[in-house]
From Swiss-Prot:
Family membership: Belongs to the DsrB family.
Name of this chain's protein: Protein DsrB
InterPro entries, per the entry: Dextransucrase_DSRB (IPR019717)
Upper classification of the organism: Bacteria, Pseudomonadati, Pseudomonadota, Gammaproteobacteria, Enterobacterales
Length: 63
């Protein structure tokens, strides 16, 4: 996923939320995405771990 991609994010206790990627930072353990959400337009950071399905919080928006 890259900047300006539409994505969904997993948050605590609720359905996946739609947003837009503002920034991407890669690390050896995974990738951090700054995602703009309706109630957080400046963005919230989410981290996707490399080798963990449970640690995947950002995914592409299914069309």
């Amino acid at each position: 996923m890259k900047v300006n991609d539409r994505v969904t994010v997993k948050t605590d206790g609720g359905p996946r939320r739609e947003g837009v990627v503002l920034e991407v930072e890669e690390f050896s353990e995974g990738v951090m995405y700054l995602v703009s959400l309706a109630d957080y337009p400046a963005g919230v950071w989410f981290f996707n771990e490399v080798d963990s399905q449970d640690g995947t919080f950002v995914g592409p928006l299914s069309q």
